[in-house]
Amino acid sequence: MPLQAIPLFSLILPVLVAGKFPIYTIPDKIGPWSPIDINHLSCPNNLVVEDEGCTTLTAFSYMELKVGYITTIKVSGFTCTGVVTEAETYTNFVGYVTTTFRRKHFRPTASACREAYNWKATGDPRYEESLHNPYPDSHWLRTVKTTKESLLIISPSVADMDAYDKALYSKIFPNGKCLGVSLSSPFCSTNHDYTLWMPENPKPGVSCDIFTTSKGKKATKDGKLCGFVDERGLYKSLKGACKLKLCGVMGLRLMDGSWVSLQKTEESEWCSPNQLINIHDFHSDEIEHMVVEELVKKREECLDALESIMTTKSISFRRLSHLRKLVPGFGKAYTLINKTLMEADAHYKSVREWTEVIPSKGCLKAGGGCYPHYNRVFFNGIILSPDGHVLIPEMQSALLQQHIELLESSVIPLRHPLADPSTVFKGDDEAEEFVEVHLPDTQKQISGIDLGLPEWKRYFLMGMSAIGFLALTIILAVCCRRIKRRKQSKPNPVELIRKVSVTSQSGRAIPSWESYKVKTGDQPQV
């Protein structure tokens, strides 16, 4: 808000303590002084282009950042992974078929990935069918390999775009960065040799939708472009502007950090890497409108002060401060020398630090050096206090200060990669875990009997095998029975000897050894 009449020391003290000089305009070129009458005093119109005498205004359209534009540009994309599924079958002699599935990878082409993504996005069944395992083939006593190539689409995969060079940043890119997508190079390589990253929209530059068209007025002098009045009514000089491309669009970065799609007729230097642009958000846009209103209000205050001077036919240092030009450019400076009103042409510049205006005690830096005072009076109401300090009775609007601080705090920090290089995958195992291929796991399946023959041949062979097995069983049974009979019909000599017996007188059968014992016992002893 505008500063009202308050004690001078109470105004200066807080600023000195803070160490920050708010936005202020001081002449970098001034003089010579010439006496004027009070009737020659005039208030500067800070909304009229006076810089370098560029007073010719022509309407034109230009591009600037959209209101509400955020620091990062999100680009939706997808990853495409080439997968080869191999089915290996082996049929043994009995007819059992063993099938083993293996998965490998290959590097796909961009055109094939785009087609597969379109299938998935539109719900085309061909995409799901392409992910199925191959139908295994089999032949008796042979190993058969069947392979099938598939493209696995994983979406969304979002990357961050740098508006300065259209580079893309994501952890899946090598070193976290991709130089961009174009018609000649429609994809980005990833940390995995078999995976590509592609934007969902095939048209390059569509994701870089950060501009809006505004209407303003060009300020020229003899055909030379000096600056322009923007859509909010603020004049912006092209002094110190540098060339900067945003999303491939050529433009100028102005001294206040804003960007416009203007090109100066004379050659401008390219911006250095540390010269970033400021965000154009709703708050800054609202502040800029308020700044215009504040400048209009300041002019009304100046007219009121001028009317008071004309009415009272008296002037003071404080009232002279209202006549100062509030924006950079050409204007007038006023002072009192020996009680005489003096006027000088001046070119004002904007300053931010106390040291730019007061580099040392008692030194007011203006016109290229320490400006001399006349009886402790400088100009525009600036005086030298009895203790030797330079005192400035009026400072720029707090809204302008807030505006610049907002711009400075809204720098787009996209010169530095958004991805931490230490998080980039370095091992194959990590890459495999990241891809998470959504296909059937590697598995081993054993089917029923299958000799790889047609239907009737298989049943015929099974029947003949059953008959042969039955005949073999009968033959073996007959042979075993004959051998058993032969063994039973042939007596054992040992058993014959042991089973020989005699008949005693009493008619009882006695084993041969008992008979021998009785006979030997009946003989008389000698």
Swiss-Prot record:
Residues 20-459 are virion surface. Primary surface antigen capable of inducing and reacting with virus-neutralizing antibodies. Almost all human and veterinary vaccines are based on the functional aspects of the G protein. A lipid is attached at C480 (S-palmitoyl cysteine). The chain crosses the membrane at residues 460-480. It is a single-pass type I membrane protein. Residues 1-19 form the signal peptide. This is Glycoprotein.
